[in-house]
């Protein structure tokens, strides 16, 4: 499936080349030779150079197809493993031949056997095999940086790191020795110097854990944004309950408290309580009812203020977490912006122009320019949506404070009604 997708990408990469040739403006014809002027306008990749001879054109396209073959080879680890085993067998044949020479056996048959085995290995020299492995490893690094899931089947438990480079992560789950690159799919490449510098001396490739930490930071930012939204929803639910309580008290209170109940928050509930207490006429019971109403009003006012303060603090906390989550989302958005297939097309074309992926890896500025394209717009979009979310959470907290104050004053209204019944 990976080969089919990359074949499609390779065919797409040819369109910008032909389109750039078609965009060249035709020039004037002078003395039997045509001259063309103008350059390609598209930004899909570098335009094909003008070839002076068929040999030069053949050399360019041969390099182009070689680069594409290297990309496929980076995703086909079985071939690499077979070549490695064959190279190991070639080394063993020389040892067997020398041992049989010491024992006085037939040298001619040993040489023919050794030659046959070397032919079965493909006849590749050590230089060709190492060049192929270097090219495949370079493409593996590029594909991982672009976000493709490249799993090295040979490294199930991970490789040890050197003094400056972290170990190469395997396909095992998080927590085991091979999970140095964040389980292979989420974290960065463990063999990069930036990820593993100073930590790669251990045998389990500890340097790659920097890549895993990057994935953890992304998950943390998501959890923070969810927490802010949850705080806002909780405050809104409290507001609904408070409003319902105040309305019920208004229906049970006397006519004098109706005006107070139409207000919002703690003031409405305290007015209902004092109205219920003072509406009764009697001897000692009237004074008792008024005192109970005043006491309930003061308790309700204090409770409302305390709840309002708590809600304000919660709103501020939600806004803070929302803004920090927005900053994290903006950073991750700018890093992950752009289409990985588009970038892969540009990298394949650039590697063809430079004569191979090894030359491209030696020029990190060109590679970084392609990697960082189209990232700023994605980051800005993420930051805008996060900011809107934190504002909504703050508004919900304020509404919750007003409603909760009304609910707390329900006890005051009940005390006034009891005093009236006592008369």
Swiss-Prot record:
Residues 81-93, 102-111 have a biased composition (Basic and acidic residues). Residues 1-20 form the signal peptide. It is found in: Secreted. Residues 31-42, 173-183, 248-284 have a biased composition (Low complexity). Residues 28-47, 78-133, 159-219, 236-288 are annotated as: Disordered. GO terms for cellular component: extracellular region. It comes from the Eukaryota. Residues 159-172, 205-219, 236-247 have a biased composition (Gly residues). This is Glycine-rich protein 1. Its main location: secreted. The keyword Phosphoprotein does not apply. Nacreous layer of shell (at protein level). Transmembrane segments: none annotated. The keyword Secreted applies. It comes from Pinctada maxima (Silver-lipped pearl oyster). Keywords: Secreted, Signal.
């Amino acid at each position: 499936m990976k080969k089919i997708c990359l074949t499609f990408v390779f065919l797409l990469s040819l369109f910008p080349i032909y389109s750039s040739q078609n965009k060249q403006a035709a020039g004037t014809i002078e003395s039997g030779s045509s001259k063309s002027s103008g350059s390609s306008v598209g930004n899909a990749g570098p335009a094909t150079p003008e070839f002076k001879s068929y040999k030069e054109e053949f050399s360019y396209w041969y390099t182009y197809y070689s680069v594409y073959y290297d990309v496929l080879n980076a995703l086909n680890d079985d071939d690499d493993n077979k070549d490695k085993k064959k190279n190991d067998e070639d080394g063993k044949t020389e040892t067997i031949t020398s041992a049989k020479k010491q024992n006085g056996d037939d040298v001619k048959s040993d040489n023919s056997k050794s030659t046959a085995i070397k032919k079965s290995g493909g006849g590749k020299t050590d230089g060709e095999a190492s060049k192929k492995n270097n090219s495949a490893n370079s493409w593996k690094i590029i594909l991982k940086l672009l976000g493709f899931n490249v799993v090295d089947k040979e490294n199930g438990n991970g490789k040890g790191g050197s003094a400056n480079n972290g170990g190469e992560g395997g396909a095992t789950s998080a927590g085991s020795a091979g999970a140095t690159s964040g389980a292979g799919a989420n974290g960065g490449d463990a063999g990069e110097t930036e990820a593993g510098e100073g930590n790669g001396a251990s045998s389990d490739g500890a340097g790659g854990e920097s890549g895993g930490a990057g994935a953890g930071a992304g998950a943390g930012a998501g959890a923070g944004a969810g927490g802010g939204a949850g705080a806002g929803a909780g405050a809104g639910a409290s507001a609904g309950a408070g409003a319902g309580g105040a309305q019920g008290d208004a229906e049970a209170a006397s006519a004098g408290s109706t005006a107070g109940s139409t207000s919002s928050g703690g003031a409405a509930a305290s007015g209902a309580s004092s109205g219920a207490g003072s509406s009764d006429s009697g001897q000692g019971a009237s004074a008792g009812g008024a005192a109970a109403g005043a006491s309930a009003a003061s308790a309700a006012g204090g409770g409302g203020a305390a709840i309002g303060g708590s809600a304000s603090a919660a709103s501020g906390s939600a806004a803070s977490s929302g803004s920090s989550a927005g900053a994290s989302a903006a950073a991750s958005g700018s890093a992950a912006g752009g289409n990985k297939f588009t970038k892969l097309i540009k990298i394949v074309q650039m590697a063809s122009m430079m004569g191979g992926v090894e030359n491209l890896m030696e020029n990190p500025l060109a590679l970084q320019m392609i990697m960082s394209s189209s990232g700023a717009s994605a980051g800005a979009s993420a930051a805008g949506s996060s900011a809107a979310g934190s504002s909504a959470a703050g508004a919900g907290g304020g509404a919750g404070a007003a409603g909760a104050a009304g609910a707390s004053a329900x006890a005051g209204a009940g005390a006034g009604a009891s005093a009236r019944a006592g008369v």
